[in-house]
Amino acid sequence: MADTLGKSELEVIKPQKREIRKGQVRKHIITVKVRNEMGVLARIATLIAGKGYNIEGLSVGETHEKGISRMTIEVIGDDIVIEQVVKQLRRLIDTLKVSDLTDVPHVERELALIKVYTPSSRARDEVLRITEIFRGKVVDVSPDTYTIEVTGDEDKINAMIELLKPFGIKEMARTGKVAMRREMSIKEEENE
């Protein structure tokens, strides 16, 4: 299926309108829509590493379109070099759409699973209270631990982790961000 896509079916993205300040280093959130082919992730990671940057976060998953995946990549870097990376990503053969969401309105979320020690009823009650405040949920229970699932933005997850640290975090798994441009942002761009 992916090999049958023609150039006319690929989305063309207008360059983002933003002021690029030389030397400014900050976190960028880049989304990449790709054909779900072997080696695509490796080529993208190599391109970014080749510019001297580490991928801080990465989420990849299928989209509603058969044979198409979406990547959300977090990378900290200089605006000018990241702009070059975005342009080079657009040229990769299996890349269909690339967007730097850093300076446009967007929604981002991540998920964390946090296994916390709960050796007493008091600890269990307090961990449950914190979980409810953050709208998380307990997804696994053992005699000495609760495993909590929480979703939200980076600040929310970091705040919950800080509150759970005094109980002792036994284990934690955290996804990279998933991000999507806000609909109003897309419509505004189309009207320009």
From Swiss-Prot:
GO molecular function terms listed in the Swiss-Prot or TrEMBL record: acetolactate synthase activity; acetolactate synthase regulator activity
One record GO biological process: isoleucine biosynthetic process
First-level EC class: transferase
A Pfam match: ALS_ss_C
Alphabetical keyword list: Amino-acid biosynthesis, Branched-chain amino acid biosynthesis, Transferase
Pathway(s) it belongs to: Amino-acid biosynthesis; L-isoleucine biosynthesis; L-isoleucine from 2-oxobutanoate: step 1/4; Amino-acid biosynthesis; L-valine biosynthesis; L-valine from pyruvate: step 1/4
Example of a GO cellular component annotation carried by this entry: cytosol
Protein name: Acetolactate synthase small subunit
Originating organism: Aquifex aeolicus (strain VF5)
Taxonomic lineage from the root: Bacteria, Pseudomonadati, Aquificota, Aquificia, Aquificales
Designated gene of the protein: ilvH
